[in-house]
């Protein structure tokens, strides 16, 4: 008896659908692309329960006849191609004829469409047609998706929370708003209008989605033999802690390619500090035969015929555009050796699109990998005691009963004083970092009421997150309110901050926390993490002049809690006992 069996068609269809439809955001993506391919100039998207229970995409496109509606839900039915060679000359979003059939297989689907002559309503459940009836509708199509994955419980079980799914759908809609500014979009969550964007410019859409960016510039289109580069970028002053503000489109398709991000940031050169990632919406337009878009089920990746040239052109274009910012000055080498060096660096970084395997974590690259590692100076070496002095000097115990009456500060870096049984040396910067860190862990810090509140304009995704994280922010001393503005955007008004933060840092900390929580596939490290980073950076530095009371307070904190290392793991102090000193000088 044969062990290998041919799968039933029903199972095959469900497996195939799972390659295209992975979550509500992928459904919205496919349906909006269908609307755009139908020449729609107005599109409305609505979701409920994060899109898990209901998704609607409605447009004013060319619509479908009764016969086309019935054919459209069959797999591999399309109006875009008819022969194999057509795949390499694609100008539309869709071409494989999988979207509607895949969605129909895993949901309860209703399609209402009119080609301008007649209108019909088609009901499909789990891929099976229930009925089709005549109805009334203006030219265009409305697709309603109910109960996604109702017939695949295991798949439905692994959908994310409503908040996360809503956020991913919102980001998909925002990407379409950016790439199609000439199309009006209405986006509703439940029954609330989140975006109502009429036809406009790329600058208009960029300001709506990234209102925190106050200075940006359009890229002057660069035309080469194989492609054109255009888009919009932020000045180096406006950055995020991850690359979520960088969006790339190839022939108007959103794509994921880490080397595109790398090339984009290389264009900024030394204008960026480590860990800073600027904003940018980049459009790469190719002749269809110069790219392959048929290498990924959701068409999220492309294969370039000359990838090294693409990456180099992006970097050069960004450099040129940055000259528009009046404050920006950067020496751009025209030396051929520098260009050659850059080209080789790009080409050596795994330039194999066909071998690139997409993982969830790569959708939203996380830059918060090791907070304290970046703080450690490269020249630091652990303390090496003299040969006759014990290694236990790195684990000193201080007398807690009294504070020193006298001390000296060496090189504006070290506090030196006499303890009851020896000599103590403290690195006051490392000590202050640890003190601040302990206060954070114990929530022992004061709050500061701001005389002039801070106003932060935010896009819809961040506004939603701000609302969800209100209690978390209040726990750490923030007090704020959320306001919706007349243009549909919103802002957070911060009235109170924790005293361990500088007022100038508060807005950035707030945004960094939101960025941490917006990454749907990774557990956020949270507000403590970001606050610790900023607070440690605000600790007293080498060269700072400390008052007598400030030195006493540092010593008191170190003694009372017996703190030994800073948050980076470096020693805070060393102690030489009198007996060790006597031994070294051969007095005993």
UniProtKB/Swiss-Prot annotation:
Pfam families, per the entry: DNA_mis_repair, HATPase_c_3, MutL_C
Xref: InterPro entries: DNA_mismatch_repair_CS, DNA_mismatch_repair_MutL, DNA_mismatch_S5_2-like, HATPase_C_sf, MutL/Mlh/PMS, MutL/Mlh/Pms-like, MutL_C, MutL_C_dimsub
Superkingdom of this protein's organism: Bacteria
GO terms for biological process, alphabetical: mismatch repair
SUPFAM superfamilies: ATPase domain of HSP90 chaperone/DNA topoisomerase II/histidine kinase, DNA mismatch repair protein MutL, Ribosomal protein S5 domain 2-like
GO terms for MF: ATP binding; ATP hydrolysis activity; ATP-dependent DNA damage sensor activity; mismatched DNA binding
Keyword Hydrolase found: no
Cellular component GO terms, alphabetical: mismatch repair complex
Keywords recorded for this protein, A-Z: DNA damage, DNA repair
Keyword Disulfide bond included in the entry's annotation: no
Annotated family: Belongs to the DNA mismatch repair MutL/HexB family.
Record function comment: This protein is involved in the repair of mismatches in DNA. It is required for dam-dependent methyl-directed DNA mismatch repair. May act as a 'molecular matchmaker', a protein that promotes the formation of a stable complex between two or more DNA-binding proteins in an ATP-dependent manner without itself being part of a final effector complex.
NCBIfam families assigned to the protein according to its UniProt record, in alphabetical order: mutl
Protein name: DNA mismatch repair protein MutL
Gene: mutL
